[in-house]
Amino acid sequence: MYDFESKKIVVIGTVFMDIKGYPEGTFIPNGRNAGRIEYKYGGVGRNVAQDIAGLGLKPVFVSITDSMGHGAAIESDLKESGVITDYMLRIPNGIGTWMVIMTPDGDVCANLSKRQNLIPVSLLLDEKGDEIFADADAIAIEIDLEEEIVSRVFRLAEKYQVDVYGVISNMTIALNRIEYINKCKCFVCNRIEAGQLFDTDTEDKSPNEMLDILKDKLNDFRMECMIVTLDKDGSVYACKDETSGMCPSDQIDIVDSTGAGDSFFAGVSAGLICHMPIDEACRLGTEMAAVVIQSTENTYKAD
């Protein structure tokens, strides 16, 4: 019914190596903790690209990977998933690192990250931006990337009249990108991030209360649609055409919550790009997130 395979989606974002610690019991910050450690390929952009590929599309990923170490393996893994990696630069120490301790119920207990320097991507966009964007159907980008990158992406998007779908990993940085958030076709964030963006208390709000806040605050912004994820309470959405609603979450056992937000964003974006109604797009994103949550993997893979 929906034509996923013919759409060209350009994804611009980060690549990380995730180091995940799973304690055998309750994590004791000042004590010795036994458990297991797993290394997973991560980064919001990388995850989103691979999630979209899991739906049968062949997204174009614009990013940086390492010229040594895990770089070749990360790129190979993306290619095998169907991601086009022609515009990934290889640079020494090019990827970021995220260390995380998980709780027994699959939530993040503590984390630390070394951000990736993506400035060379701005030079790539100067050189090959027209080639990348000219026939694109849509762009998915981490709004909190370097200003030099974000400004070029939106300039190219306007030049070729391509819709931009935005997600974030750091709202503190994204608050300095409001002009770009306003230019998004759809912007997705979680409850805490929405509270920061709206300068409003969103903690412990019910889905109905959160939807009312979203519909009211959307009037202060220019993006066409916005979706706020609410963890176990699902998500709420509102659009300028007054379409709004709630999408409940699936009741499942959580193994590892990391990557779920990325897969939700990937599903929503792909659905909207393929002309799904927003309620169906949110349902697709929710189903993809449910698959990711039930494993220690960071990305969605269809059965």
Q: Model-derived features: where do they sit?
A:
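Glycine-rich phosphate/adenosyl-contacting loop at the front of the ribokinase-like
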Residues: M1-I64, G69-E80, I254
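Structural alpha-helical scaffold elements that stabilize or flank donor/cofactor-binding regions
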Residues: E131-I132, E179-Y180, N219
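Gly/Ala-rich phosphate-binding loop of Rossmann-like dinucleotide-binding domains
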Residues: A53, E158, I273
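Conserved beta-alpha-beta core of the PfkB/ribokinase-like small-molecule kinase fold
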Residues: A138-E209, D233-S235
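Conserved phosphate-binding/catalytic region of the ribokinase-like
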Residues: Y2-V11, N33, I173, D204-D303
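Conserved phosphate-binding/catalytic loop of the ribokinase/pfkB sugar-kinase fold
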Residues: R90, V100-A138, I143
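A glycine-rich helix N-cap at a beta->alpha junction
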Residues: D77-P92
